[in-house]
Amino acid sequence: MVSQFLHWYEYNKPVPYRSLLQEKIEPGQTLIVKGSTIDESQRFTINLHSKSADFSGNDVPLHISVRFDEGKVVMNTFANGEWGKEERKSLPIKKGDSFDIRIRAHDDRFQIVIDQKEFKDYEHRLPLTSITHLSIDGDLYLNHVHWGGKYYPVPYESGIASGFPIDKTLLIFGTVEKKAKRFNINLLRRNGDIALHFNPRFDEKAVIRNALAANEWGNEEREGKMPFEKGVGFDLAIKNEAYAFQIFVNGERFTSFAHRQDPNDISGLQIQGDIELTGIQIQ
C-alpha cells in the first residue's frame, strides 16, 4: 500500500531550530529543508547530531555550513571531540533567495541536493544509526522541514488503502534520470481503468494526460510547457477536486484534468519509466 512519506512536516519554524528524531534514519530516507535568506545573511547551518541537538561535545555525523561570506558550502563531521577534514564546494545559493536543501541517506553516504540539483556525495564518517537529533541555525527564515521516504522500485505499483477521494492530494517526490525519455503515473480504478494517465515525454517535449475506460484511450491533452528537466528533482502534487484533478509541479500549478468518470473510485497507483522515486504520500 502507498506508505506515508512523512515522519514529520513542520511549517514556519523558529530559528534556532532543534528536533529529536522520532525514529532512526533509514537508508533511502530524505530530509528536506526549505527556507529563505535575506541580503544581509552571512551563514546558516544544518546539523545531524548524536545524543543531543547541540555542540556540547557529542558527535555530529553531518555538519553543513552555508557560508555567503566565503561563497562556499562547508561539510564536516565532529567525532570523538574533534572536527575532521572539511569538504568544500562553491555555493549555488544567492543571498536573498529561497532555497531547498535535501539530504538523502544511503548505506555509505549522504546525497546532498540543492534546489533539486545534485550537489555533493558525503561519505559517512560515523554510523547512520548514531543520528538522533537535527538542528538548523543562522541567518535564515525556515519555512518547513520534513523527513521520510524510502527506496522505491520502479516500476512501482501499489493499492491505496484509504482510497483517493475528493479533497485528497497525492505527493510524489523524485528525480528524472539524466538520459530520460519518458515516465508515467497512472491513477487506477477498481475495475482496472485509468482515471489519470500523466506521461511526461522528453522525446516529444510534452506532457500527455489521458484516461483509459473499457480498454479504450480517450482524447489526449498535451497543452503546456514541459515542467520537468532531465537529471533534476521534482515535487509533483495531484489534488482530487470535485470536477478535475489539479496538478502542480514544484509548487506551481501546471494544469487540470477534468474527471471522465467517478472521482471517488480510485484504488491504485502505478509509476513507470525513467525516474528515481524518493517519496510518495497522500494527505
Swiss-Prot record:
Listed InterPro entries: ConA-like_dom_sf (IPR013320), Galectin-like (IPR044156), Galectin_CRD (IPR001079)
Signal sequence region: none
GO biological process terms, semicolon-separated: negative regulation of mononuclear cell proliferation; negative regulation of nitric oxide biosynthetic process; positive regulation of apoptotic process; regulation of apoptotic process; regulation of cytokine production; regulation of mononuclear cell proliferation; regulation of nitric oxide biosynthetic process; regulation of phagocytosis
Keywords attached to this entry: Lectin, Membrane, Repeat
Main subcellular location of this protein, as a coarse class: membrane
Annotated residues for binding of a beta-D-galactoside: W217, G218, N219, E220, E221, R222, E223
Cellular localization per UniProt: Membrane
One Gene Ontology term, aspect cellular component: membrane
GO MF term set: carbohydrate binding; galactoside binding
Domain Galectin stretches: 17-148, 156-283
Disulfide cysteine pairs (residue numbers): none
Function description: Binds galactose. Exerts immunomodulatory effects on host peripheral blood mononuclear cells to down-regulate host immune response. Hemagglutinates human, dog, rabbit, chicken and mouse erythrocytes but does not hemagglutinate the erythrocytes of goat, its natural host.
Subunit note: (Microbial infection) Interacts (via domain galectin 2) with goat TMEM147. Interacts (via domain galectin 1) with goat TMEM63A.
Protein name per its UniProtKB record: 32 kDa beta-galactoside-binding lectin
Organism: Haemonchus contortus (Barber pole worm)
Taxonomic lineage: Eukaryota, Metazoa, Ecdysozoa, Nematoda, Chromadorea
